[in-house]
Curated annotation (Swiss-Prot):
Entry superkingdom: Eukaryota
UniProt function note: DNA-dependent RNA polymerase catalyzes the transcription of DNA into RNA using the four ribonucleoside triphosphates as substrates. Specific peripheric component of RNA polymerase III which synthesizes small RNAs, such as 5S rRNA and tRNAs.
Gene: Polr3gl
Biased composition (Basic and acidic residues): 139-160
One biological process term in Gene Ontology: transcription by RNA polymerase III
This protein's UniProt keywords: Nucleus
GO function term, MF aspect, one: chromatin binding
Entries under InterPro entries matching the protein: RNA_pol_III_Rpc31 (IPR024661)
Alphabetized PANTHER family for the sequence: DNA-DIRECTED RNA POLYMERASE III (PTHR15367), DNA-DIRECTED RNA POLYMERASE III SUBUNIT RPC7-LIKE (PTHR15367:SF4)
Subunit description: Component of the RNA polymerase III (Pol III) complex consisting of 17 subunits. Pol III exists as two alternative complexes defined by the mutually exclusive incorporation of subunit POLR3G/RPC7alpha or POLR3GL/RPC7beta. Found in a trimeric complex with POLR3C/RPC3 and POLR3F/RPC6. Directly interacts with POLR3C.
Protein name: DNA-directed RNA polymerase III subunit RPC7-like
Similarity section: Belongs to the eukaryotic RPC7 RNA polymerase subunit family.
Positions with biased composition (Acidic residues): 161-193, 201-218
GO terms for cellular component: nucleus; RNA polymerase III complex
Length: 218
């Protein structure tokens, strides 16, 4: 019969690490807990390497700081949102919160860079002002009469031009009709001559044979 534990022992739990590696032997008591706070600045085991001294190191440091400042002034640098004040002032609109594109003194050789990265200068939009046109004085009666006379003269000229064109068209049509009639008369004369000269009714046929009519006909 199997035991109650199903073959599982109920011994003491084994440690997951070797105590001798920590420095505690078998049978030794554990050190008492420390109730004091840890030191604020514990001693450093590894000290940082000293900065390179000399002109070369100072030049590299200044160049790095200048590059950082230039990158922060570019329009592509994302700045944190500034919290708005509870009370807005009138002068807040005109204060420059950051550098404008025109104030950036950075002119690289754009031939070596893609065109998408080129800085586009913002143009200040001017406020549109409404232009008030002066009112034209009303036309007097003399001006109206002059315009009417001009229109009448233009109408007369147009009528004269149209009448001349109509007369020219009528003359051309009459000439064409006369030419057609002459052509028809000539054709008619030629047709009658042809009929008179070549028509044969057959009366003269067999005129010489009338003397022999007394003979018997078979």
């Amino acid at each position: 019969m199997a035991s109650r534990g199903g073959g599982r022992g109920r011994g003491r739990g084994q440690l997951t690490f070797n105590m001798e590696a920590v420095g505690i032997g078998k049978g030794d008591a554990l050190p008492p807990p420390t109730l004091q706070p840890s030191p604020l600045f514990p001693p450093l085991e590894f000290h940082p390497v000293p900065l390179p001294a000399g002109e070369e190191g100072e030049y590299v440091l200044a160049l790095k700081q200048e590059l950082r400042g230039a990158m922060r002034q570019l329009p592509y640098f994302i700045r944190p949102a500034v919290p708005k004040r509870d009370v807005e002032r009138y002068s807040d609109k005109y204060q420059m919160s950051g550098p404008i594109d025109n104030a950036i003194d950075w002119n690289p050789d754009w031939r070596r860079l893609p065109s998408e990265l080129k800085i586009r200068v913002r143009k200040v939009q001017k406020e549109r002002t409404t232009i008030i046109l002066p009112k034209r004085p009303p036309k007097s009666t003399d001006d109206k009469e002059e315009t009417i006379q001009k229109l009448e003269t233009l109408e007369k000229k147009e009528e004269e031009v149209t009448s001349e064109e109509d007369e020219e068209k009528e003359e051309e049509e009459e000439k064409e009709e006369g030419e057609e009639e002459e052509y028809d008369e000539e054709e008619h004369e030629e047709e009658t001559d042809y009929i008179m000269s070549y028509f044969d009714n057959g009366e003269d046929f067999g005129g010489d044979s009338d003397d022999n009519m007394d003979e018997a006909i078979y």
